[in-house]
Amino acid sequence: MPVLTRSRQPRKQRRALYRAPLHARQKLVSATLSPELREKYGVRSLPVRKGDKVRVMRGDFKGHEGKVVKVDLRRLRIYIDGVTVTKADGTPVFRPIHPSNVMIVELDLSDEYRKKMIERRAAGRRGGGNSE
């Protein structure tokens, strides 16, 4: 979790989360990678993006897999293809899921910036860089 405030007071921690800017919220929608992806990329977790394939690990939809349809940074929730509930009038609506309850099983690597970011983070975990 990114450091939003130095305070230890729960009141101020909650306020910082509530008032967090969108660029900080992007890190708050991180999910763990599957063991296979972890081994392949050398990274433990990444922010969820639209197009990633995820598996729900907790809750009523545990075990469901699907592509991420939408990432709502304001509510800190993600919407997954196939994870829907039916309204009283019969129309299906996506069920918001917190990213901590999912595991990324397939990454959408269509973005070059994301590829570079993964390589940077993996190098940091390996101890690469210019330390002596």
From Swiss-Prot:
Query: Tell me, which GO biological process terms does this entry list?
Result: translation
Q: Which GO terms describe its cellular component?
A: large ribosomal subunit
Q: Which GO terms describe its molecular function?
A: rRNA binding; structural constituent of ribosome
The record's SUPFAM superfamilies line, in alphabetical order, gives: Translation proteins SH3-like domain
Pfam families xref list:
KOW (PF00467), Ribosomal_L26 (PF16906)
Cell cycle is among the record's keywords: no
CDD domains under this entry? Answer: KOW_RPL26
UniProt KW Ribosomal protein keyword = yes
* Quaternary context: Part of the 50S ribosomal subunit.
- Report the family membership: Belongs to the universal ribosomal protein uL24 family.
Instruction: Tell me, in a sentence or two, what this protein's role is.
Output: One of two assembly initiator proteins, it binds directly to the 5'-end of the 23S rRNA, where it nucleates assembly of the 50S subunit. Located at the polypeptide exit tunnel on the outside of the subunit.
NCBIfam families referenced in this protein's UniProt entry, alphabetically:
rplX_A_E
Would you tell me the protein name for this molecule?
Large ribosomal subunit protein uL24
Natural source organism: Aeropyrum pernix (strain ATCC 700893 / DSM 11879 / JCM 9820 / NBRC 100138 / K1)
